[in-house]
Amino acid sequence: MKNILAKAPSKSGTYAMFIGRWQPWHDGHRWLIHQALNEDKKVLLCVRDVPVSESNPWTADQILLNLADSLKDLIEQGHVKIMKIPDIESVNIGRGVGYDVIEHVPPQEIHDISATKIREQMKQEGKL
C-alpha cells in the first residue's frame, strides 16, 4: 500500500486536502474532489482512522484499499494522494496560515446522496 500512497509526483507541492471517513466512497465524494481537480489542483484525501461501528463498518485500511482501487488512474497520474490520519475532533486554524479554507456547496442531486442510506441499502442486499 505504501507504494501507491507515495506515487504522486507533483508539479507543485500543494494539495487541496479533504478529510473524511468515506464510508463508503460514493458519487457525492467524487463530485467534491472533482471540484478541486477541475481547477487543476492536486487532491490529498485523508482517511480518518475511526473505530469500526454501525456507521463506520470498514476499517481505515479497508477504505484506503477501496480508494486506491477506485482512484487508481488519478493516483498513478499524480493528481491524488491518499493517507490515513488519526481520528480528529476538530479542524483548527490561525490567522494568516498560508492557505484557503474552501467550502464546496453541491447541487441538490449531489447533496441528497447519503452514505447512511447507501449503508442501509447494502445491509438489505446482504453486502454489509
Q: What are the roles of these predicted feature ranges?
A:
Residues M1-L128:
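Nucleotidyltransferase catalytic core that binds NTPs
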